[in-house]
C-alpha cells in the first residue's frame, strides 16, 4: 500500500491549443439567418454576421462561383473572427483555405502561381466510386503459420450475417491486415474486395458477455443483415490542387506529404480541368466550390489584383473573401490611391461587408467568453476594469492581459483574477498608445532619431492651423 501512495497522478496535456479565435464555433445565426446577440462565440456585428450567413448559403448551394466579398472595417472589429465563423459553419466537407496577403511573396514561386494554388486548394471534387465489400460477423478464424517461421501464411475465416454464413480462404496479404487490426471471433468487420482493406466496425452484441471488463474504445454493434457481399458507394473528396500535385511528373504524390510542390505547369491544370468536366458530365464527380480567405488584402500588389480579376471570371473559381483594415491608401506597386488599397475595377466586382467597432457591453461579453476559453476565473470588478482597458487601448491588448493576469493570480495562489492582478499586468506591459507616448518623450535618447521628420510634421501642423 505504501508503494501505491507514492504513485503520482497527472492530467493528460491537452492537444488543442488555445488560439485567438479558438472560441468561435460558428456565425451564431438561427434558422432564418437572424443573428443572435451572443451565440457560438460570436458577439455583436449582427449585420455583418447576417451578410456572412447569406454568403455561407451561396457556398453550400454550390451553384454560383467566382463571387468576391470584402470584409472592411477598423482594426479589432472581428473581420477574421467572421471568416473563422464562416469556416466553422461550412464544416469539413467544404474546402476553406486561409492565407495572408503577404504569403504570396516568395523567391521559390511567383505570385500568380501561389494564388493559383490557393484558388485550386479551395475547390473540392467529390468522386463517386462503387465498391464490392464483404460485411459480417467473424464466427471463427484459423491461421496456419509455417513451422520454420518463414514463408507464406494461409488461413480460413467463417463470416456470417443474420441470414447466411460462408467460409473464405485467406491469402498472405489479407492475413497481415487481419493481424494488424487484431481481428478475432465476435468482431464485425468489412473487407473491401478491390483494395483488400479490412475495417473493424466493433464487436457483436451476442459476444458482450465474453469478457468481464472491456475498454472504453470497445463498441458493440448489431450483426449485419442480408447478403454477405454488398455493393457500396464510396465518395472521396479531394481538392483540385491535390489532383494537380499527383499528376505533376516532377513531384508526384509524395509532394503532398512533403509540402514542397513547386510550380505546376498550366498544361497539367488544363488537362485536369477537362477530365474533371468529363467526370462531371458522366455523373462520376461533383465540383464543390469552397472559400479562399485572404487576410490583409491590401498587401497584394497590382499584378495580383489583375490576376484575380481574370481568375474570378472562371467557372472553376471559388468564393473569395478578403479582409482589410485600410482606408484610402496607395495600391501596392503603384502611386495611385484607392479605397482599401484595392483597384476600383476589382472593388466593382466585390460585395462589401462592413464591420463596426464593438460597444463597451459587447467588449465585456467577448472578454468573458475568452476567460471561459482560457479557463481563467475572474470576478466582476476585474472584468469591468479589463473592459475599460479594452475601450481605452485595444481589444487585443485586453485579451492578451487575461493570460498574464491569470499567471499573476496563480502565483499568489488565488482562486480568481482580481483588480490588483489587472493593475499589476497593466503596469508591467505597455499598450500601443502608452508606448508611442514614451517614444515621443524620450525620442532624442533613441538611436537613429530623424529630426527632419519631426520638423516636417511640425510644418504640416503649422499649415493646418
From Swiss-Prot:
GO terms for cellular component: NuA4 histone acetyltransferase complex; nucleus. Belongs to the RuvB family. It is an enzyme of class 3 (hydrolase). SMART domains: AAA. It is found in: Nucleus. It catalyses: ATP + H2O = ADP + phosphate + H(+). Its EC number is 3.6.4.12. GO terms for molecular function: ATP binding; ATP hydrolysis activity; ATP-dependent activity, acting on DNA; helicase activity; transcription corepressor activity. The gene is rept. Gene3D superfamilies: 1.10.8.60, P-loop containing nucleotide triphosphate hydrolases, RuvB-like helicase, domain II. InterPro entries: AAA+_ATPase, P-loop_NTPase, RuvB-like, RuvB-like_C, RuvBL1/2_DNA/RNA_bd_dom, TIP49_P-loop. This is RuvB-like helicase 2. It comes from Aedes aegypti. One of its GO terms (biological process) is regulation of cell population proliferation. Forms homohexameric rings. May form a dodecamer with pont made of two stacked hexameric rings. Component of the chromatin remodeling Ino80 complex. ATP binds at residues 73-80.
Amino acid at each position: 500500500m505504501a508503494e501505491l501512495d507514492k504513485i503520482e497522478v497527472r492530467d493528460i496535456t491537452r492537444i488543442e491549443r488555445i488560439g485567438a479565435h479558438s472560441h468561435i464555433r460558428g456565425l451564431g445565426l438561427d434558422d432564418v439567418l437572424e443573428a443572435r446577440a451572443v451565440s457560438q462565440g460570436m458577439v455583436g456585428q449582427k449585420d455583418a454576421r447576417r451578410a456572412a450567413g447569406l454568403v455561407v448559403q451561396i457556398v453550400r448551394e454550390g451553384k454560383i462561383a467566382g463571387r468576391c466579398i470584402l470584409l472592411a472595417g477598423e482594426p479589432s472589429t472581428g473581420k477574421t473572427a467572421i471568416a473563422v465563423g464562416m469556416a466553422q459553419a461550412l464544416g469539413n466537407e467544404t474546402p476553406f483555405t486561409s492565407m495572408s496577403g503577404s504569403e504570396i511573396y516568395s523567391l521559390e514561386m511567383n505570385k500568380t502561381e501561389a494564388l493559383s494554388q490557393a484558388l485550386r486548394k479551395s475547390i473540392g471534387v467529390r468522386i463517386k466510386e462503387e465498391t464490392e465489400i464483404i460485411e459480417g460477423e467473424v464466427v471463427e478464424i484459423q491461421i496456419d503459420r509455417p513451422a520454420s517461421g518463414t514463408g507464406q501464411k494461409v488461413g480460413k475465416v467463417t463470416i456470417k450475417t443474420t441470414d447466411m454464413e460462408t467460409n473464405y480462404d485467406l491469402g498472405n496479404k489479407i492475413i497481415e491486415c487481419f493481424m494488424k487490426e487484431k481481428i478475432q471471433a465476435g468482431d464485425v468487420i468489412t473487407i473491401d474486395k478491390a483494395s483488400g482493406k479490412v475495417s473493424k466496425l466493433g464487436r457483436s452484441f451476442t459476444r458482450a458477455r465474453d469478457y468481464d471488463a472491456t475498454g472504453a474504445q470497445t463498441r458493440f454493434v448489431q450483426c449485419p443483415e442480408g447478403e454477405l457481399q454488398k455493393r457500396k458507394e464510396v465518395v472521396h473528396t479531394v481538392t483540385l490542387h491535390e489532383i494537380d500535385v499527383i499528376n505533376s511528373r516532377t513531384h508526384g504524390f509524395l509532394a503532398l506529404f512533403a509540402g514542397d510542390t513547386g510550380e505546376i505547369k498550366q498544361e497539367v491544370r488544363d488537362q485536369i480541368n477537362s477530365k474533371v468536366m468529363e467526370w462531371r458530365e458522366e455523373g462520376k464527380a461533383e465540383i464543390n466550390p469552397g472559400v479562399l480567405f485572404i487576410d490583409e488584402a491590401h498587401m497584394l500588389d497590382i499584378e495580383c489584383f489583375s490576376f484575380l480579376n481574370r481568375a474570378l471570371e472562371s467557372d472553376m473559381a471559388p468564393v473569395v473573401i478578403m479582409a482589410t483594415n485600410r482606408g484610402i491608401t496607395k495600391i501596392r506597386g503603384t502611386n495611385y490611391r484607392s479605397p482599401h488599397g484595392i483597384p476600383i475595377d476589382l472593388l466593382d466586382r466585390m460585395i462589401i461587408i462592413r464591420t463596426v467597432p464593438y460597444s463597451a457591453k459587447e467588449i465585456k461579453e467577448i472578454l468573458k467568453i475568452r476567460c471561459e476559453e482560457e479557463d481563467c476565473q475572474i470576478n466582476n470588478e476585474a472584468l469591468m476594469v479589463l473592459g475599460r482597458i479594452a475601450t481605452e487601448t485595444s481589444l487585443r491588448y485586453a485579451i492578451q492581459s487575461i493570460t498574464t493576469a491569470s499567471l499573476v493570480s496563480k502565483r499568489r495562489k488565488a482562486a480568481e483574477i482580481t483588480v490588483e492582478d489587472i493593475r499589476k499586468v497593466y503596469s508591467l506591459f505597455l499598450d500601443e498608445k502608452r508606448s508611442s507616448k514614451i517614444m515621443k518623450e524620450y525620442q532624442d535618447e533613441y538611436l537613429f532619431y530623424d529630426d527632419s521628420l519631426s520638423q516636417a510634421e511640425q510644418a504640416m501642423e503649422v499649415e493646418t492651423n
